Amino acid sequence: EINSPGEPGVYYHMGIGFPSGPVSAEAAAILSELHEQSAARNRALVRRVNAYLAPVEIDYEADVLPLTPAGNATERHIVVAYIEAARRKEPDPTVFWADRLGMDRAAVQKAMADSAGFQNVVRNKLMKKGGPGYVQPGHDTFPPVEKLNALTVACGALPCAAWLDGLSP
């Protein structure tokens, strides 16, 4: 493990000091490739979770992408789409979520009172390790750190290491 608990070889990395404005052609090409890789990973996640949550299902293009500011969806956008789909399709979303999340109905009701907290519960139960949407990352699941460094430098920023607790390596 590096800095993603339970996911050996996965390394959260970041860049700092990105200037505003248009990016170079080199950076645009890398961004396009990363966007395609992320979208493919998200679509696969949606297929797995759709199978588990049926009949509550979402469409990545129709239900998830409109929730994003620039078409760059995260697990959190996907979770919001599922919560909205259950609200639209289920007569009692609390009963639905209690069944699908393996939780007591009262616990689900309490969690649902805090929108962000409930989103975290859904994400953790469905998309994180042990959940039906989770797949152990492989060597090609995420871009190599060298590609992220190249993007960061092409944008005129600085590549940086990220630490799990923000304090220690």
Where are each of the predicted segments found?
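Extended substrate/RNA-proximal surfaces in nucleic-acid metabolism proteins
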Residues: 1-168
